[in-house]
Amino acid sequence: MNILITNDDGIASSGIKALEAVLQKEHDTFLIAPLRERSATSMALSIYDSMRVERINDNHYIVDGYPADCVNIGLHGDIFPRIDLVLSGINRGVNMGHDIHYSGTVGAARHGAVHSRLSLAVSSGNITKDYDYIREAEFVRYFIDEYSSLLKVGVVYNMNIPFDFVSSMENLRITRLGKRTYEDTYSKKNIIGGIADFYLGGSKLEHATEEGTDFTAFFSGKISLTPLSLDQTDISLVQELSDTLSKSLS
């Protein structure tokens, strides 16, 4: 299988190195990643500016752009053979609930899904400095080898692995997205007249406890796998709104 590996933590991150080290034993891997940290960039693309792309060798490229840029170049830049699977991660920190809308890790995988590739985003709850993520990568390899035939194109599979996890399929749960709330705080500096620099000082994160969600699985020590559709239409509201508007116009 031809696997494109990318992330939003940057080319030097331990997570992406672990995936490549483990997967290249049995697959053809092609690594293309951002030059630097690009967290919370979702599916951003560099549309109006050029990007500097550095070729290390035939299988390794560095992009001074966003994670989705990396996927786009990897798929359409005539640098790799046809890619079968877009794999994004291993992210240093989880991406659950509403996080997925901000995440560059998930955004990169979603870009692969938009272009009809199998797409998997992987995040870890282990943010220990200098951690190597090899155990997580080994689980990802096993999952891909044994279950990739069950995956569908046009879907993003979002995997979150707890800090202390049992590496077995019996420990994996198929989940839905939970609900995350954010309480953001900003600081202002360099105030001159009506101009100031705003800095996001941090976010207080909370989540709802509901059965069947990624949060519930994760915090009970299970690996969560959430299938994410590209179609974000709220089907339940389509007919309801249509009927309501029709009545208001009649």
UniProtKB/Swiss-Prot annotation:
User: tRNA processing: present as a keyword of the record?
Assistant: no
Name the chemical reaction catalysed here. Answer: a ribonucleoside 5'-phosphate + H2O = a ribonucleoside + phosphate
Signal peptide per UniProt: none
| Localization terms from the record | Cytoplasm
Q: Which UniProt keywords apply?
A: Cytoplasm, Hydrolase, Metal-binding, Nucleotide-binding
A GO term, aspect molecular function: exopolyphosphatase activity
| Pfam families recorded | SurE
> What EC number(s) does the entry state?
3.1.3.5
Q: What cofactor is this protein dependent on? A: a divalent metal cation
Q: Kindly give the PANTHER family that the UniProt entry links to this protein.
A: 5'-NUCLEOTIDASE SURE, 5'_3'-NUCLEOTIDASE SURE
Reported function: Nucleotidase that shows phosphatase activity on nucleoside 5'-monophosphates.
Name assigned to this protein? 5'-nucleotidase SurE
Biological source species:
Leptospira borgpetersenii serovar Hardjo-bovis (strain L550)
